[in-house]
Curated annotation (Swiss-Prot):
Heterodimer of an alpha subunit and a beta subunit. PSII is composed of 1 copy each of membrane proteins PsbA, PsbB, PsbC, PsbD, PsbE, PsbF, PsbH, PsbI, PsbJ, PsbK, PsbL, PsbM, PsbT, PsbX, PsbY, PsbZ, Psb30/Ycf12, at least 3 peripheral proteins of the oxygen-evolving complex and a large number of cofactors. It forms dimeric complexes. This is Cytochrome b559 subunit alpha. GO terms for biological process: photosynthetic electron transport chain. It comes from the Eukaryota. With its partner (PsbF) binds heme. PSII binds additional chlorophylls, carotenoids and specific lipids. Its main location: plastid. It comes from Glycine max (Soybean). The gene is psbE.
C-alpha cells in the first residue's frame, strides 16, 4: 500500500458543501461572462475578426480568391486596394 500524500480524495471534494457553494456561483458567472463577451461584439474587437455584416461590402461582393499560380502578389495587391 502506498503512502498518503495528504491530499483529499476527489470523492471527498465533490461531496462537500463548500465545493458546491463556490461552484454554484463561479460556473454560471463564467457562462454569463462568455455570453456577454460574444453578444456585445467585444470578441470581434479583441480578436480582430470582421463582424458578420463586414465580410462583403457594397463595392466588393466577390470572394477574394487567388487564382493565378504565378502572380499571387499582384492579385493580393488588387484585393488590398479594394478594402
Amino acid at each position: 500500500m502506498s503512502g498518503s500524500t495528504g491530499e483529499r480524495s476527489f470523492a471527498d471534494i465533490i461531496t462537500s458543501i463548500r465545493y458546491w457553494i463556490i461552484h454554484s456561483i463561479t460556473i454560471p458567472s463564467l457562462f454569463i461572462a462568455g455570453w456577454l463577451f460574444v453578444s456585445t461584439g467585444l470578441a470581434y474587437d479583441v480578436f480582430g475578426s470582421p463582424r458578420p455584416n463586414e465580410y462583403f461590402t457594397e463595392s466588393r461582393q466577390g470572394i477574394p480568391l487567388i487564382t493565378g499560380r504565378f502572380d499571387p502578389l499582384e492579385q493580393l495587391d488588387e484585393f488590398s486596394r479594394s478594402f
